[in-house]
């Protein structure tokens, strides 16, 4: 599969206004998304990875084939992504665990209670993204992509067995809109508090949500517009997808400037 993308930087003061504009454009309320993102680095050469390890025995055949193709394709940084809710963070318990929030704001009153987060029940998926293609004539970022379901819980042992070592982790928070075949994600990266790192591996407990800090100190967000093309070799489908992104860029030009990203800034190769 191929992923075609455009990006824009959104100042913090423009965030709420853009949410409203996107809601009107897509005729839908934003779907709030909160994710743990674990970064792993390949340390084993391609072709040496055995995906039939431990808990991976529970994976279905199709998922296992997809996983094997990704992990044996080259030496890359890859991300393991797990959905969470604010209730999972210490100090913000919730009986529903529903990650959707209204557009009125993201702030919640802190609570002194502990979270109900269970690391052993945390679902995961592996997301592979290749370095964007070089020399593309179209003014969009295009790259190979794939994803596969992983076993729940502690994912470190299977990833190590597959030739990947844990590097770091962070949280992504944002809102998703869908316009026809375009997935629009207005988001920011949140970092864990300094000194809160557990032993070298993913956290088993999450800190209070209020303790997370934005990576971008100005508080700005990133607007990402993406289309997934199943057959990247079909030039007509790729052109059509690009035109759809250009159409969105035109619709939003009074608010933001959507453009392709610098190729090397999205380089996922493990050197």
Curated annotation (Swiss-Prot):
Q: Does the keyword Nucleus apply?
A: yes
GO molecular function per UniProt:
transcription coregulator activity
**Where does this protein reside within or beyond the cell?**
Nucleus
Residues annotated as region Disordered?
89-119
Sorted alphabetically, the Gene Ontology cellular component annotations on this record are:
core mediator complex; mediator complex
Record's family?
Answer: Belongs to the Mediator complex subunit 18 family.
Q: What does this protein do?
A: Component of the Mediator complex, a coactivator involved in the regulated transcription of nearly all RNA polymerase II-dependent genes. Mediator functions as a bridge to convey information from gene-specific regulatory proteins to the basal RNA polymerase II transcription machinery. Mediator is recruited to promoters by direct interactions with regulatory proteins and serves as a scaffold for the assembly of a functional preinitiation complex with RNA polymerase II and the general transcription factors.
This chain's protein is named Mediator of RNA polymerase II transcription subunit 18
In the UniProt record, what gene is named as encoding this protein?
A: srb5
């Amino acid at each position: 599969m191929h992923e075609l993308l455009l990006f824009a930087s959104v100042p913090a003061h423009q965030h709420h206004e853009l949410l409203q504009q996107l809601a009107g454009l897509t005729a839908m309320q934003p779907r709030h998304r909160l994710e743990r993102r674990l970064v792993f680095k390949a340390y084993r050469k391609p072709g040496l990875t055995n995906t039939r390890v431990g808990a991976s025995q529970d994976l279905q055949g199709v998922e296992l084939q997809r996983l094997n193709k990704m992990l044996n394709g080259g030496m890359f940084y890859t991300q393991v992504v797990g959905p969470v809710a604010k209730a999972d963070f210490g100090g913000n318990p919730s009986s529903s665990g529903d990650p959707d929030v209204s557009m009125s704001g993201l702030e919640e009153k802190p609570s002194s209670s502990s979270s109900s987060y269970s690391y052993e029940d945390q679902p995961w998926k592996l997301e592979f993204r290749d370095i964007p293609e070089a020399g593309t004539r179209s003014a969009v970022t295009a790259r190979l992509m794939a994803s596969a379901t992983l076993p729940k819980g502690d994912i470190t042992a299977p990833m190590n067995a597959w030739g990947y070592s844990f590097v770091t982790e962070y949280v992504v928070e944002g809102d998703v809109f869908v316009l026809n075949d375009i997935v629009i994600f207005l988001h920011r990266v949140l970092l864990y508090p300094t000194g809160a790192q557990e032993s070298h591996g993913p956290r088993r407990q999450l800190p209070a949500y209020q303790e997370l800090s934005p990576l971008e100190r100005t508080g700005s967000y990133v607007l990402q517009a993406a289309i997934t093309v199943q057959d990247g070799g079909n030039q007509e489908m790729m052109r059509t997808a690009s035109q759809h992104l250009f159409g969105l860029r035109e619709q939003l030009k009074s608010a933001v400037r959507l453009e392709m990203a610098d190729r090397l800034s999205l380089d996922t190769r493990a050197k």
